[in-house]
Amino acid sequence: MKLHDLKPALGAHRKRKRIGRGIGSGKGKTGGKGMMGQKARSGPNPSPSFEGGQMRITRKMPKLRGFKNRWRIEYQIINTGQLNNVPDGTELTINAMIEQGWVQPAKPVKILGDGELERKLTIHAHKFSASARARIEAAGGAAIETPWIVERRSRSRGPNPPRHHRKAEATPGA
């Protein structure tokens, strides 16, 4: 027996039913689209919020308007008052905050100025509020911003390289 002699078993492949080819075919006349209303016609359907000309509920109620910004960056917040249990003179990096269980590695970290800071700390974070920076520097410490690099995944080629690598790859002979 050779590969070209192989055939599927009888009844394994059912023939495709052609739609709209007469009422005797089993899928004729309306072709599986039900009664012939607007949604049975060719072309796009009305939007999900369309109510046949009646004022739609999304326009009646202001709270249902607007949109969700897909590029919004949601920060994890740490207040300066929470940093008083760290020993004096410590360099507090983002990795140290992750090890302490204060933040998760998936989102950027922002330090806010709620609460007094009594320790001299060098703090690394992605963002600082103006009041937090002032409190850290008033206590004799330093606020160092580290960039937040987002790795957006593309479906075809895996994760995209970070921005600072892209220019080096693009320039020939570099």
UniProtKB/Swiss-Prot annotation:
Sequence ranges of Gly residues compositional bias: 21-35
GO molecular function list: rRNA binding; structural constituent of ribosome
Gene3D superfamilies in UniProt: 3.100.10.10
GO BP, one annotated term: translation
Function of the molecule: Binds to the 23S rRNA.
NCBIfam families on file: rplO_bact
Similarity comment text for this entry: Belongs to the universal ribosomal protein uL15 family.
Stated name of the protein: Large ribosomal subunit protein uL15
